[in-house]
Amino acid sequence: MQRIVYLERESVIAEVRRPAFAHQWTEYAKTAPGQVVERLAGATIAIINKVPLPAAAVNALPELKMVAIAATGTNIVDLEACKARGIVVSNIRGYADHTVPEHVMALMLALSRNLIAWRESVQAGRWQQSDQFCLFDHPIRDLHGATLGLIGSGSLGNGVARLAEAFGMRVLRAEHKNSATVRPGYTSF
């Protein structure tokens, strides 16, 4: 029987489906870094979100076979230590593939249009008091024709690139740092 320990249940508000295979499930609302090894003792599967799992912790857990990260990033886990031990590491792929790129574009539009400054001018009554049909207090820039540099070409970076290109932006993707070659469509880091 697999022993599954979820170290940070409060970090995910969605219902978590339990696996169909025989297992013992233990969950904690939150876990501090100093509690990781104690709470994962005897676990075969660890579910984590933000609490780090460094090499020392990985190596102190001989029964551990899998680390499931309830997030997109894997930077909280020592991947080399897991690989050396044959521990499978999985993360949530495809999460917010549309939501995050759309939010990025919304923020770029807000910045390029100076949305906050314009809102404050309207709230202060400047627009209503203007002798002109509009105000020229804050610069407005178009995204069309602008250049966007992206670091990362995973699903989120590619989603942002697609939307930016649809806006008529020039997209530069950064090649991996210290890469010996630069792929077509990329620029050196």
Segments (PLM) and residue ranges:
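Rossmann-fold NAD(P) dinucleotide-binding segment
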Residues: 52-64, 81
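Short acidic/histidine-rich motifs immediately flanking catalytic phosphotransfer sites
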Residues: 40-45, 62-64
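Rossmann-like dinucleotide/phosphate-binding beta-alpha-beta segment
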Residues: 134-189
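N-terminal glycine-/charge-rich "phosphate-binding" loop or analogous flexible N-terminal tail
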Residues: 1-43, 172
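Phosphate-binding beta-alpha-beta segment of Rossmann-like dinucleotide-binding domains, i.e.
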Residues: 93-147
